[in-house]
Amino acid sequence: MDLPGPIHDFLLVFLGSGLLVGGLGVVLLPNPIFSAFSLGFVLVCISLLYILSNSHFVAAAQLLIYVGAINVLIIFAVMFMNDSEYSTDFNLWTVGNGITSLVCTTILCLLMSTILDTSWYGVIWTTRLNQILEQDLISNSQQIGIHLSTDFFLPFELISIILLVALIGAISVARQ
């Protein structure tokens, strides 16, 4: 979208905070239905971020595939589970939560140090090269393929990892 700078920054901060709140809702809410709805909110916020970065096709695919199909399937599977397992008393912190938060914090610190220590010169050069190549391409599907493999590679892979973790969690909760 071609928005003025302050409006673009406000929407970026608003959607980023929506992602954080939704992600915390997925992890911290005791009811799996509410966690699934929170996951849907996170996926919609990611789709809106794609729209904000002028990638309308990826945003539409995100909405149709992840929100429209996968998240609805997760909600449908969770609704068939026995609800008596989830009591009303909510234990906020257990040993497993502490170990999980320690592992996640360690992974986050390693990821941040890797991002800060990496020389991004080659990535910028590759992007510029693909922008030069992009003018010679005829079809939009070739341009989408180049953008998915260069500019939007990291967000595309991150959402697939988030989806994989969510599906593994839904399967493990359904088996119990």
UniProtKB/Swiss-Prot annotation:
Which coarse location class applies to the principal site listed for this UniProt protein?
Answer: plastid
Keyword flag Chloroplast: yes
* Top-rank EC class of the record's enzyme: translocase
Query: What does this protein do, in the record's words?
Result: NDH shuttles electrons from NAD(P)H:plastoquinone, via FMN and iron-sulfur (Fe-S) centers, to quinones in the photosynthetic chain and possibly in a chloroplast respiratory chain. The immediate electron acceptor for the enzyme in this species is believed to be plastoquinone. Couples the redox reaction to proton translocation, and thus conserves the redox energy in a proton gradient.
Compartments it resides in: Plastid, Chloroplast thylakoid membrane
Any one GO cellular component localisation term in the record: chloroplast thylakoid membrane
Instruction: Quote one Gene Ontology molecular function term.
Output: NADH dehydrogenase (ubiquinone) activity
Q: What is its EC number?
A: 7.1.1.-
> What membrane topology does the UniProt entry give?
Multi-pass membrane protein
Return the similarity comment: Belongs to the complex I subunit 6 family.
Which superkingdom is the protein from? Eukaryota
**Segments passing through the bilayer:** 10-30, 32-52, 61-81, 92-112, 152-172
Description of how the protein assembles with itself and partners: NDH is composed of at least 16 different subunits, 5 of which are encoded in the nucleus.
Q: Which residues form a coiled coil?
A: none
Q: Which Pfam families match?
A: Oxidored_q3 (PF00499)
Alphabetical list of InterPro entries matching this protein: NAD(P)H-Q_Oxidoreduct_6, NADH_UbQ/plastoQ_OxRdtase_su6, Nuo/plastoQ_OxRdtase_6_NuoJ
Reactions catalysed, semicolon-separated, are:
a plastoquinone + NADH + (n+1) H(+)(in) = a plastoquinol + NAD(+) + n H(+)(out); a plastoquinone + NADPH + (n+1) H(+)(in) = a plastoquinol + NADP(+) + n H(+)(out)
Which keywords does this Swiss-Prot/TrEMBL entry list?
Chloroplast, Membrane, NAD, NADP, Plastid, Plastoquinone, Quinone, Thylakoid, Translocase, Transmembrane, Transmembrane helix, Transport
Query: What is the name of this protein?
Result: NAD(P)H-quinone oxidoreductase subunit 6, chloroplastic
